[in-house]
Amino acid sequence: RLRNLDTRVDLDALLEPARSVGGDYYDAMKIGDDRLGFAIADVTGKGVPAALYMAMSKALTSAALSRMQVDPAGMSEAINAELLKDNSEAMSVTMLLGILDLKTGEVRLVCAGHEDPIVVDCDGDQRRIKLEGGPPFSIVEFPYPLERLALKPGETLVLVTDGVTEAQNA
């Protein structure tokens, strides 16, 4: 269970790296009184180089969220620009970056080459949310489109990395 950021929402996460060091990560933080910022990402590669690049991308994401920015598209372009500056290992980062409005249930999302989110309704029915998105970070400058979805009370937003889909296909 993630730290209790707000009583209006439950956050849970599971991270089981295939190796002792990996490139997947997630983060969530409160933005003001009524917003929750979140990210889930996967760095290409494995081992120490991926873990170091993951740490850098996580730091950039956390810094953007902690500055209480509420524009995922602008944050994505800034994170991508920073990652493009120092990428001697030619790595890339897939990411879903979003802001949840805790009052309205509106989720504003940006997808950088990441797995599409899934919404599970109160009856357990699932629907995959197809996002336009763009390429993974640190490949090319790109104007990442802002996408929106509305969560109803009791619905669950499920975010995964490709580790889940790879495990399902194994």
Where are these regions (language model features)?
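Short, intrinsically disordered, charge-balanced linker/junction segments flanking boundaries
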Residues: 167-170
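… and, occasionally, acidic/histidine-rich disordered N-termini of signaling adaptors
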Residues: 1-158
